[in-house]
């Protein structure tokens, strides 16, 4: 059990969100105009349904709130806003936060320790984030705290806790589990060879299936060029689940860029 020292400041609703400015981040640059319009519509509903709560003196404004909402809705762009119905609040610290974590061991003794967290998702509770890592989530780098925590929420729709297997048809579960564990083993092999800091995929993905799904969801949306060629079978499963193909978006965007450069000559 974690005790949260909340001192909160809730944002007020704003009907005039700066969507054009909010979209102007590398993570969202490859979306088509139609996808951007649908993402904005989802983000508007997100801001109507969820409370963004700033903690410990952090101040939210309309641009920050709009960008947070857009990133929350990117994974469910083709799934629908109801896939985010498992929580009502997003709590935002200014930086990674320290919490008191209490846990019970196998013989019933309760232990307490202070733990630094970047974010948290709970089955029946809010999503907790921090602004420093949210800012780092704007880039197309493979790191995205919001998508990571959203992936946990999507994962938990399939049961009481995150397992690494989201809500997919039963016939696909065995194949998903096989490919996910193969990816975990491959990532661990690279870590053993070059070390955690030099690994091309975040080492956290090798810790357990739930974290592997969440970490690879980050790469799926923000660095598909690192995910798709390395784990092609698992990539296709992610495409089927999310009903999106960020790698295809990247190819189309690159081709359009090349065409634009040729037209200038």
Curated annotation (Swiss-Prot):
Q: Which co-factors does it depend on?
A: Zn(2+)
EC numbers, comma separated? 3.4.11.-
Q: Which domain of life is it from?
A: Bacteria
Which keywords appear in this protein's UniProt record, sorted alphabetically? Aminopeptidase, Cytoplasm, Hydrolase, Metal-binding, Metalloprotease, Protease, Zinc
* Family to which this protein belongs: Belongs to the MtfA family.
GO molecular function per UniProt: aminopeptidase activity; metallopeptidase activity; zinc ion binding
Q: Which NCBIfam families match?
A: PRK15410.1
Per UniProt, where does Zn(2+) bind?
A: 111, 148, 152, 211
| Protein known as | Mlc titration factor A
What does this protein's record comment on cofactor binding?
Answer: Binds 1 zinc ion per subunit.
Q: What is its main location?
A: cytoplasm
